[in-house]
Amino acid sequence: MAKKFNYKLPSMVALTLVGSAVTAHQVQAAETTQDQTTNKNVLDSNKVKATTEQAKAEVKNPTQNISGTQVYQDPAIVQPKTANNKTGNAQVSQKVDTAQVNGDTRANQSATTNNTQPVAKSTSTTAPKTNTNVTNAGYSLVDDEDDNSENQINPELIKSAAKPAALETQYKAAAPKAATTSAPKAKTEATPKVTTFSASAQPRSVAATPKTSLPKYKPQVNSSINDYIRKNNLKAPKIEEDYTSYFPKYAYRNGVGRPEGIVVHDTANDRSTINGEISYMKNNYQNAFVHAFVDGDRIIETAPTDYLSWGVGAVGNPRFINVEIVHTHDYASFARSMNNYADYAATQLQYYGLKPDSAEYDGNGTVWTHYAVSKYLGGTDHADPHGYLRSHNYSYDQLYDLINEKYLIKMGKVAPWGTQSTTTPTTPSKPSTGKLTVAANNGVAQIKPTNSGLYTTVYDKTGKATNEVQKTFAVSKTATLGNQKFYLVQDYNSGNKFGWVKEGDVVYNTAKSPVNVNQSYSIKPGTKLYTVPWGTSKQVAGSVSGSGNQTFKASKQQQIDKSIYLYGSVNGKSGWVSKAYLVDTAKPTPTPTPKPSTPTTNNKLTVSSLNGVAQINAKNNGLFTTVYDKTGKPTKEVQKTFAVTKEASLGGNKFYLVKDYNSPTLIGWVKQGDVIYNNAKSPVNVMQTYTVKPGTKLYSVPWGTYKQEAGAVSGTGNQTFKATKQQQIDKSIYLFGTVNGKSGWVSKAYLAVPAAPKKAVAQPKTAVKAYTVTKPQTTQTVSKIAQVKPNNTGIRASVYEKTAKNGAKYADRTFYVTKERAHGNETYVLLNNTSHNIPLGWFNVKDLNVQNLGKEVKTTQKYTVNKSNNGLSMVPWGTKNQVILTGNNIAQGTFNATKQVSVGKDVYLYGTINNRTGWVNAKDLTAPTAVKPTTSAAKDYNYTYVIKNGNGYYYVTPNSDTAKYSLKAFNEQPFAVVKEQVINEQTWYYGKLSNGKLAWIKSTDLAKELIKYNQTGMTLNQVAQIQAGLQYKPQVQRVPGKWTDANFNDVKHAMDTKRLAQDPALKYQFLRLDQPQNISIDKINQFLKGKGVLENQGAAFNKAAQMYGINEVYLISHALLETGNGTSQLAKGADVVNNKVVTNSNTKYHNVFGIAAYDNDPLREGIKYAKQAGWDTVSKAIVGGAKFIGNSYVKAGQNTLYKMRWNPAHPGTHQYATDIDWANINAKIIKGYYDKIGEVGKYFDIPQYK
């Protein structure tokens, strides 16, 4: 089944911070690299003011699609609705250049869409035969006999521990004897024109697959869910495309369009939606992105499957298509999601010529789980989707069986659901080398600078070089030969054919036939006219002359993709121009105002049962007796764990009903944003015995806080904890039990199972192996120190070495530990010598005594060595084999310390004594102030840091070795600190992660700001020269109010990133505008006091920033400037009735970003747009408008003010203003807002020039 990929011309919309202009322009200004000697598409807020209906449509799309839906058809067969017996012309006009193809020019880039194109079907195909004579009158095609191998059915069987031998032939008995029939006479229709060709391009009879009765599929596993799917004949939805232009595109290891299989994932998030998952992925694609998401209702493809994604680790990414299953919560939705996934997987396998082959049990095949990749290939440590599937009483084997069945149905090997038999089997979509189909086409294309050349026939092995690049041509035919697709391009105006080009060598767009019109428009002087619609800089017919708007008389119109182009005359010059540059001079016909829909009430209440737990934040809105209360009552029940029994939604607010965990006492309703919430499963009774360390805290509730301690474990040595109850909170297990007469809850992480001989348990033959990756198969950077035991198993150069080398020479010595890796059931660490620099090898941790190693801290102190001491050592915590001076040699001497470090609970000092340097335990020294391991009291500390080390951990308690969790998912995200504590010279911060959980993190894993530097590959002189040489010169005000052309030195000074980065205010032009900072709602509301309708809208700005990935301050500054600090009528709201603005209506529509508020009538146009978008509250206008802003420059790659102004990736193109100080002015404004809010910018992206 062939994928139909098309291109579109989106309007890239940008909103200025200074001067409220809305700018729209053609895609070539935004997406293509242009001739940089003269700027063809530089935009200025003073020059262009119109936007397009395309931008409006994008705002309403719930998944931010840049396209519609995708239809899969067969890439090898195109079946005709018309079979014209015309003879093709083999000798096309060859306007080619025999020189080599110029590969130096950068290729055009174009945004893509997937507007569905009907694919006609053919009942006959022809294959090449090298010894067939071909006449000049026909295409250079050859003929061959059709080989029908489909009668021998070989269904794909599930790989499992025991495969039934008889399954291989279960479908063969039903295979009919081949019969030969004549092709039916073709009907002639207008479109689409599709012709199949023989050697003479005449219709012929072919061996057709006979009508036959197909066998029904025999399931290989029992599955009530699969039976439900079959019984209800569930249909998969159309595949939607939601591609993102800034995702990277890299080939698989075997090349573009050559994946080796598909991987099953699940999102591991019970509370997310498919839109939420996609939005989160787009904002964090640098960490991971996948090809598609599937839930019970939709299949959304988020990245082209011809290119790899980052979803399954370094080994699997270059091989497989990655698809995520979004969690559903009821039987029917889960069944639909499995049906949708199986259908999508079978479609991909069929499309890429792959057969279903489970890799689950042998590590070989085309259908993988993430667990299988972790187990057999490595590079990742995940075990999904088995846990999620088991939670629905489903398994991977059942899903694979469904994929296999879907594939066989699509291949025409078994009967579809709901039928006893079927007609001719559908043609397998694996391309057959040599089969050709040709179809009529009505489109346009531009040949990229780097291409394979022009082909006289599609059978030519190589193309001839051409200079006809970066020009728009008409496309008259499409041909598919095997897995290669070609377009026949011709001169748009004369029809002269140039030749065939490969699909990948062009930027293609659909086109409708031109229509005659008779319409007058006004057009600005300087606007370019082109010889063809969607013309390029090489096809300019002239520019509009005169001063002031001129009259353009249009006589022809054509739609290219979704853009309209008109052909006409102005001041004696004729040519094509985009309708976006024209203004209709005719009096507009009033459009009837649609009957306003009933606004959604904000008082609609929904209540549902819930089983969870929550802790009320210290800062909160209080407890509510009912969710209708306007204000809550203050409460002291903060930072305690309560049970949650219900959740309620009222308008835009969500509440939880909290109660005492151990009694039926209700506490009250709390707002969702005022708690840290976790899912909880119902408690279950257990009878288990564990050991627990003395001092371990017991709590009155699971996931209890310091305010809910029930006591601490007493005694010496491990104590016996008898558990009687167990409950899962989120992903953690808590047990209730008794130890030494005290009862309470404790996390399972603090318990150990007493050693006991294991009883062998007989397993049924059909048992499925447990799907748990016990330890991460990744290497972690650590800071530890270890002593090698005398009796050890040896040293390894790699953890993969089965046999270790003798480690006797390392025994009884201390070494630094820098790396740690789990391999199988064993854990290994990498030892380094005492200089830290040279790795020695890997030891099993069982052969070592290991302690944490702190950070070295400088000190200047004199000490007296105690009479009884352990000597001067080469390394902290050194053994007798590493002593430099014995205890007798340094006793009573003076030790001059220069640095110190903590080893576990001890402190060692490095210094000099008797002209020798080394380490001494602090316990062996006496000083005026004794050096001891210190733990300072935790103190309040409010600051938002950025997590910079994805390989680090966050902790439940500081310095804990057990209760720690990876920071990988939170890397480069904000961390709001509320407390600080120093333990053994290590500073720890306690605060809130981006998911709302509270944790401790080391200061070394945090940064005050995250600055990334990107190399441009050009010098500052080069880019300044390009900017200074533009047709529309950069502007500067040397005298206030008077604009003049900036010279080279002015431009170079304005673009100097090194200078700008040193200025505390100008540095903000490098602030990433596509990265929210999680600024607290309280701070935002304080800043918005007195700002008109924007007052108290902090929650809306916070939601908008998180939902669409936009910096909060950038959004706020936009809104303040557009609305005059929240006081404009557009912001305060109005209605449009009978095409007139009504400001006193009951329902008002708000527009706080000035979207679509065109200069000719900004209030009416802006309110009309808000009404269409449904923005009947200020908060809706904020959130909805943020999506519009996010889809403009911010998401188009120009995500800083500097990039908007100077576009360092493609200097001189797609730039936002001509004023060289534009970025400086706006940087100072944003810095000023940050200062008023009391925050600083966290994420900066600075270009660097050579």
Curated annotation (Swiss-Prot):
Region listing for Endo-beta-N-acetylglucosaminidase, in residue ranges: 770-1250
Task: Point to the regions of Low complexity compositional bias.
Answer: 173-196
Annotated signal peptide: 1-29
**Ranges of biased composition (kind: Polar residues):** 103-138
Checking Pfam families in the record gives:
Amidase_2, Glucosaminidase, GW
Provide the reaction this enzyme catalyses: Hydrolyzes the link between N-acetylmuramoyl residues and L-amino acid residues in certain cell-wall glycopeptides; an N(4)-(oligosaccharide-(1->3)-[oligosaccharide-(1->6)]-beta-D-Man-(1->4)-beta-D-GlcNAc-(1->4)-alpha-D-GlcNAc)-L-asparaginyl-[protein] + H2O = an oligosaccharide-(1->3)-[oligosaccharide-(1->6)]-beta-D-Man-(1->4)-D-GlcNAc + N(4)-(N-acetyl-beta-D-glucosaminyl)-L-asparaginyl-[protein]
Superkingdom to which the source organism belongs: Bacteria
Question: What post-translational changes are documented for it?
Answer: Undergoes proteolytic processing to generate the two extracellular lytic enzymes, probably at the septal region on the cell surface.
Q: Give the matching CDD domains.
A: PGRP
Q: Name one GO molecular function term.
A: mannosyl-glycoprotein endo-beta-N-acetylglucosaminidase activity
Give positions of region: N-acetylmuramoyl-L-alanine amidase. Answer: 199-769
The protein's job, in short, is:
Endohydrolysis of the di-N-acetylchitobiosyl unit in high-mannose glycopeptides and glycoproteins containing the -[(Man)5(GlcNAc)2]-Asn structure. One N-acetyl-D-glucosamine residue remains attached to the protein; the rest of the oligosaccharide is released intact. Cleaves the peptidoglycan connecting the daughter cells at the end of the cell division cycle, resulting in the separation of the two newly divided cells. Acts as an autolysin in penicillin-induced lysis.
Domain comment text? Answer: The GW domains are responsible for directing the proteins to the septal region.
Q: What name does this protein carry?
A: Bifunctional autolysin
Q: Tell me which species this is from.
A: Staphylococcus aureus (strain MSSA476)
The organism's taxonomy opens as: Bacteria, Bacillati, Bacillota, Bacilli, Bacillales
